A protein has these predicted regions:
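Low-complexity, highly charged intrinsically disordered N-terminal segments
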Residues: 37, 42, 48-59, 63, ...
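Glycine-rich beta-alpha loop elements in corrinoid/cobalamin-binding modules
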Residues: 74-176
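Short boundary motifs at domain starts and secondary-structure transition points
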Residues: 22-32, 95-97
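ER/secretory pathway lumenal C-terminal domains and tails of membrane proteins involved
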Residues: 3, 21-26, 59
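N-proximal accessory regions
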Residues: 1-7, 45, 139-141
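Short acidic, S/G/P-rich loop/turn micro-motifs used as interaction or catalytic elements
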Residues: 44-47, 112-114
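Sequence-level detector for compositionally biased, low-complexity segments
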Residues: 16-19
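Helix-enriched interaction subdomains in cytosolic or periplasmic regions
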Residues: 1-14, 64
Length: 176
């Protein structure tokens, strides 16, 4: 864990939501995987971890050979402000690596009111907000979930929309 992160945790409410290390968290050797996926939920840890679809997809993606899927949640306002003040980019709970260093940033979006949180997470991560500003060196930004039946409001911010039930979707987009 980053020393800067250790310094700010005592100043926020519910710091345990930002440190990972739970039972059944999937850890892999990042030098032995081909693709790293930051699986992001645009709400707090407690809301995201109670989402059955997120838990299922986390397991499905981690069962793909050569893929390590890590979790990331939107920080609460106090933590977001502390992270911005300390220049700590949004990170994954398993490795604490910044999600901007991943190959894919995948959002699970269940409702339209989460769209602003998704954009805020990209900003906090240091990822160019608009898909047109990204290069081959930045992660592919993917969004799925029930809100993707109307993905037009966030079309400028994502590279790929996955429409349909993620649990039943083929893993082909990740394997590409």
């Amino acid at each position: 864990m980053d020393k800067r992160l250790e310094r700010i945790l005592p100043r926020v409410q519910k710091p345990a939501r930002y440190v990972g290390g739970e039972f059944n968290a999937i850890m892999k050797d990042k030098s032995k995987v081909d693709t790293r996926v930051a699986f992001c939920f645009p709400d707090t840890y407690e809301i995201g971890m109670s989402n059955l679809g997120m838990r299922i997809l986390y397991g499905v993606m981690n069962n793909i050979e050569g893929v390590w899927c890590e979790r990331c949640f939107a920080p609460w306002g106090d933590m977001e402000q502390e992270m911005r003040n300390a220049n700590i980019p949004l990170y994954a709970l398993e490795s604490f690596d910044p999600i901007k260093d991943f190959d894919i940033i995948a959002f699970s979006i269940g409702y339209e009111m989460a769209f602003p949180a998704m954009v805020d997470m990209l900003d906090l991560a240091g990822v160019p907000l608009h898909a047109s500003e990204r290069t081959a060196l930045t992660p592919l930004v993917v969004a799925g979930g029930t809100a993707m039946y109307n993905c037009e409001p966030i079309a400028d911010f994502i590279d790929l929309a996955l429409i349909g039930e993620g649990e039943e979707m083929d893993v082909e987009p990740i394997e590409l």
